[in-house]
Amino acid sequence: MTIPTEISCPEEDAFQLLDKFSWFPSDDQRRWWEYTGPYLLKLLRDAKYPQKDQVPCLYLLQQLLVPYLGTFPVVGQAPLPWWSNVTTYGVPFELSWNLLHNIVRIGFEPLSHLAESGVDAFNKTAPEECVSRLACLDNTIDLARFRHFQHHLLVTPEEETWLLKEKAPLAKSGRGQQTLAVEFQNGGISAKAYFFPGMKSLATGLSPGKLILDSIERLALPGLKEPVHHLRSTLGLQDDGHPTDTAIAPFLLGVDLCTPERSRLKFYVTDQVVSWDRVADMWTLRGKRLEDPQCADGLALLRKLWDLLAIPEGYRSNIRPDFAFGTPPPEDYRPVMMANWTLSPKKKFPDPQIYLLTVGMNDAVVMDALVAFYEVLGWTDLASTYKDKVASYFPGPDFTKTNYIHSGVSFSYRHSKPYLSVYYSPF
């Protein structure tokens, strides 16, 4: 008698296998699972995940993420009780696909009824619970850096009380302080945390840029002084953390939840001036990185992507749009640009990653541009199938008439390879 060492099931049954006897304590959780499960499975298949890895990925979504997604959004019903920083529409869930390494990623903001009801006004409880459970599931997840930045970038109980008393009523957007992301790779998971110090800034009077840089400095990592210096110089960051150019705004810190010696730090900004010259300055650190051949190679590919997308240049006045769920962005809406730089004690210059946000652009045009870029990169299989893949994720819409499916595209270049991720609307 042969005993099988692993369970396999037909691909089409991976979702049904977990769904058949699943139980959820609320209708919201059931609806989140029924919507996100098939969506994730399609993306996993297209990213060529082995069949044996698909069920564990779905199981993690069902058991750990879905319970923390809060109220399921419904068009025409009351606005979501919590406006998340994760997506343009405040929905706390986003799928993306790293096309070079075929890695699927879920970005999300863990929520609970405490945050949605206002009891946990700055949503500190659910992210803490969720990340602790993640760490219990995989021993490669290390929370040392997470705890450090929690301490320095989240509002204290005293600051919460002051904000609720002195700054009321607070805007519905921007109250969230931390979000998470999980990536499925090599049969396991990796996790990242993101800290938004906007509320800490409001409570302390210190700029987000200063709060982030001070928290990094307190790590006392040898070798970080030089890359931080180059970042400060490029962005014109003054001692108070404010850039000399008011169109640029530091707003976010990203950190890998792994052992501290391997954990990367990412410093994020938005830029209200969207132009190729700004992109090139951010990529080259105003020319400082041009001595590195990889900088020029990456810049040339980034220019091709920029030209293909044909993003209109200009100043963006609307940093935080207040769109009603289920309503497409106005045809003339154009988002800001984003960038981050990875700070490492092992590298003289921080590595850039550019985010070209495409919300508001016609999806058919965006898909044509991406397909053309895949051909430039030699990704011929993806180029020939990409439109069909996206149509399977979002059945029904006419992409010549939609402008919200593709949230954005990020580009970086490391080890002589382009790293391209595409971000999709959750609905």
Curated annotation (Swiss-Prot):
It is an enzyme of class 2 (transferase). Substrate binds at E94. It catalyses: 12alpha,13alpha-dihydroxyfumitremorgin C + dimethylallyl diphosphate = fumitremorgin B + diphosphate. Its EC number is 2.5.1.110. Dimethylallyl diphosphate binds at R105, K192, Y194, Y268, Q353, Y355, Y419, Y423. It comes from the Eukaryota. Coiled coil: none annotated. Pathway: Mycotoxin biosynthesis. One of its GO terms (biological process) is verruculogen biosynthetic process. GO terms for molecular function: prenyltransferase activity. Keywords: Prenyltransferase, Transferase, Virulence. InterPro entries: Aro_prenylTrfase, Aro_prenylTrfase_DMATS, DMATS-type_fun. NCBIfam families: arom_pren_DMATS. PANTHER family: INDOLE PRENYLTRANSFERASE TDIB-RELATED, PRENYLTRANSFERASE ASQH2-RELATED. 12-alpha,13-alpha-dihydroxyfumitremorgin C prenyltransferase; part of the gene cluster that mediates the biosynthesis of fumitremorgins, indole alkaloids that carry not only intriguing chemical structures, but also interesting biological and pharmacological activities. The biosynthesis of fumitremorgin-type alkaloids begins by condensation of the two amino acids L-tryptophan and L-proline to brevianamide F, catalyzed by the non-ribosomal peptide synthetase ftmA. Belongs to the tryptophan dimethylallyltransferase family. This is 12-alpha,13-alpha-dihydroxyfumitremorgin C prenyltransferase. It comes from Aspergillus fumigatus (strain ATCC MYA-4609 / CBS 101355 / FGSC A1100 / Af293) (Neosartorya fumigata).
